[in-house]
């Protein structure tokens, strides 16, 4: 209770001193208008007395818990502060009612209390300052013991605040400097500080009290006013002195901490140094080797997942190798694969370091050592192709004595000649080894249910599979010798300089290029061969295969290839075969297995092969009557990206190998990525309809023979193009085109998310002059890789070699101005080099390559037909830069109006523009929108007398499809292109705003959008129709027309 007694004594002393303070404050307040009056001060004194009595009562009741906060130096410090805290609500009432808010002396009770109840704290600070001054006068202690009325040691508070809080330190230093300046200024007796927060006001109150000054607030309660008093003093120590001590101690501590941390780090580093040194020295020695091992392991795994590296191995060890297993995904070979992936990593002693993880190379033949040639790795491929090993490709086995087609830098998996195995079924041979024939037959039955079975009476089939590895980077000019007698079935590998590039996830039926030929019933020794060329990485040459008829000797035993072609090229070395990365899948079935076809088809008089170079002729040794030679003395047909298939005497309708069609139809299926130009002339003097495609699926006759070489035996080739956006892993759709007498087949198209209306269409077509039909599906793989741009930058105008049609054909192609003119143009049209791309081509031959066969459903227009430029004058030289032909292919659908152009009719006149036909050659980036091909449709069948403004209102649906409407005057449009809406231009001349005076062209963002709009609008009750323009519209022309 000693604290309570001392508190009572102190309070009595304070009462006595209060009276003196009130008198002094009244005298000083004469100079200050805002200071409270004497009565207010007396009232406040009485209130202070009441407050102190209340504090006495509360302290006597014992707040020992809060009294523990008291300062050890001063006896009163915390007890009074706590008592005032509890008595604050009691005091607030009288103070507020009497409006005494003027005098406040710093209250060191609590920082939080001052912030929350600033008015009360300021008033308390005023009282405490009054109590403090008498204390100073009474006890003349040093400033070290200077306290306020609540017993808070101001010195200790200020020192602690200066040390612990940098912000408060700055504020205190500032206040100290201002107060010192005020004390030294004898002219002013008071100083008013600007408004500040309650916490800063509390600091100011305490600093003013520490300097022995009177401190009040103005009427707003925000600004503090200090007055000089008789007890005003300058403390013995400046604030900065306390800070220096603090700084020295703090800096020393921090320095020690940093030094400790550094020492700890050094200890850790010393502990880690041995490990790091060992690791570093190890990595220097083994990093390269380790990298190669991991790299090869990853690539080998990816190769297995892709299943594209279908290298042919004649050794039985192929079935025990896991790396070979991963290369046989599409082959269905799953037997005998017992070796684990660790076996790939165990072989590190090979000199071919990049192939170390693989203990066995799939390019090795029986007993042959691994090829020491470096592989073509994924880094040099077009689209993520795994390692493609180059090595000796064709090896001989115990079953035959085939000559070894080996050339350095070229690995072409050629079929090892196998003995015939008696089998009534057409077998899809996975490996051409006699020991594997039986399981190959089973796998064939499982994988290709659509292949028509060979009749029982036929001789045993000989199964061959050719898997082509990567061609060499530099072609070898060595001639290739091949002995045809050792192989009953001739497999002619043809290597174009551009490689095929297939997506990673094509469906199994079309996952690889397969060329299978099934002999007809009349064939003496029918054979079934399946070609599965692996995906070829970017490389000058790609090996393709042209298969001759089975049971007959090779047409030419000695093939001397040109220096441009790889020596493995047995047939034709395509000189400049310009083709973007793509893969062609060809499945060819003779008509003998087609039950509905009783007709005999003539063989092709004109070979379908690669044309090596202009004027080049390949020798042929012998020809069997039932087999047309793969190469003839004639100029080789220009073949831009498709495999030419020679047809025996008995060749029927060609169609897709779909299970739905079973053994009824035989087809030629071609898969490839977009952007190449394709020419497949079938028959001598046949017309080439080159149908390169970029985005859209389409089925159009690719070639029709109408001239004297094959008056009735020409086999038209139809393309079916499907862009990668429409595949999405689905099997490609193939159009089935039949001879005129055959019934129609319902062919459900594979689902295409981009073109839902084309889910099911009836594909029926009539061969132009002969019943034979070749259906080629050009299926774009939907892989993650972007379509590679071919080196060709131009397409010459399509020379379609008099695309006139025979009268007996139900649907006719558009004919040019005249067949002689077209042929003349073909022969004289030069190939425009890439550097000449901006220059217009002088070719004026037929540019519209799309046929108008009414029963032929066209999936989508082919955007870019390519044309010949060199060669024999009719066919473009392979490898020459192709020019884009700005022709628009009509998206003919079943039930859509056909466009029949009779012989002599100039439906597509390029002559009206002469040789000034504007051609915008596509640059290397074929995705540019300069070439307007399948994206342009003409608006026809508008209501008569409709004006342009009214017509624009009808085109809202086109605008919703993203189409831009271009109004071309008749001078710019094609006569008659408006479908009759501009036929009355003469009489409508007085109505310049009539829509009939214009050729209305809708330019869609993509051929697919044009296709969908044509399907939607032409089949609806819309007041206009859309059709593919008969004229080649250059985008520049359309832009100029739109700007007028």
Swiss-Prot record:
Annotated ranges, domain R3H: 169-232
A Pfam family recorded for this sequence: R3H
Keyword terms: Nucleus, Phosphoprotein
Biased composition (Polar residues): 509-521, 554-572, 818-848
PANTHER family: CAMP-REGULATED PHOSPHOPROTEIN 21 RELATED R3H DOMAIN CONTAINING PROTEIN, R3H DOMAIN-CONTAINING PROTEIN 2
Region (Disordered): 23-71, 106-147, 261-288, 320-408, 433-485, 502-533, 551-600, 729-770, 807-848
Domain SUZ: 233-303
PROSITE patterns the UniProt entry points to: R3H, SUZ
Compartments where located: Nucleus
GO cellular component terms given for this protein: nucleus
Composition bias type Basic and acidic residues, residue spans: 36-56, 109-143, 261-270, 277-288
InterPro entries: R3H_dom, R3H_dom_sf, R3H_domain_containing, SUZ
Protein name in the entry: R3H domain-containing protein 2
Organism from which the protein derives: Mus musculus (Mouse)
Gene Ontology terms, MF aspect: nucleic acid binding
Compositional bias of kind Basic residues: 58-71
Domain of life: Eukaryota
Biased composition (Low complexity): 338-349, 433-449, 757-770
Keyword Protein biosynthesis in record: no
